[in-house]
Amino acid sequence: MGNCIFLIVGCSGSGKTTITEQLEQKYGLKSIQSYTTRKPRYDGETGHIFISDEEFDKLTDMVAYTEFAGNRYCAIAEQVENNDLYIIDPKGVDFFMKAYKGSKTPKIIFISSNLTTRYERMVGRAETKGKSHQEAIESSLTRIANDASEFYDYIQGQAWIDYVCKNNSNDKLEDIVDKIFDYISSCESEVR
């Protein structure tokens, strides 16, 4: 694509990672892999570039930055110029909108999912990663509580959002991905 960078924002369990992966696979879009000081959760984990605190401190030209659970995450300007999509949280969006001075037009896509759908996805995901049912419930409820404050402006429709896409359990993933791609295509043709 090329003229825009699409910032993908959504609460935990909203499906933002799955949707982004589908946009990459089906339409050939490229996604930024954040630099992070977090350790990989499992061998072969993708979606991030895992580096030490010392390596992170040497990064320059950051255009997005956030911290979560004691770990730092960022993207640098060169990554934006070479990619189409970036999964990012609200703090990262705020940083990006102030720091990014490149040629691409930023567009914010908010993936909205109801609480029940998000909860069921998070519990299921935690259980498949080895947590007991009780641990999965507790970690999911903690994330939901954290998201309620972190994403408040997005949930209430008070944040600057260019496009909202609903992704609930009764929605077909393929239809959602196609709708988002249609939006992306229309933005790219507007910016040319």
Predicted regions and their residues:
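P-loop (Walker A) phosphate-binding loop of NTP-binding proteins
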Residues: C11
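ATP-dependent small-molecule kinase phosphotransfer cores
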Residues: T36-G92
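Conserved phosphate-donor/acceptor-positioning beta-strand/loop module used by diverse small-molecule
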Residues: L85-D89, G102-R125
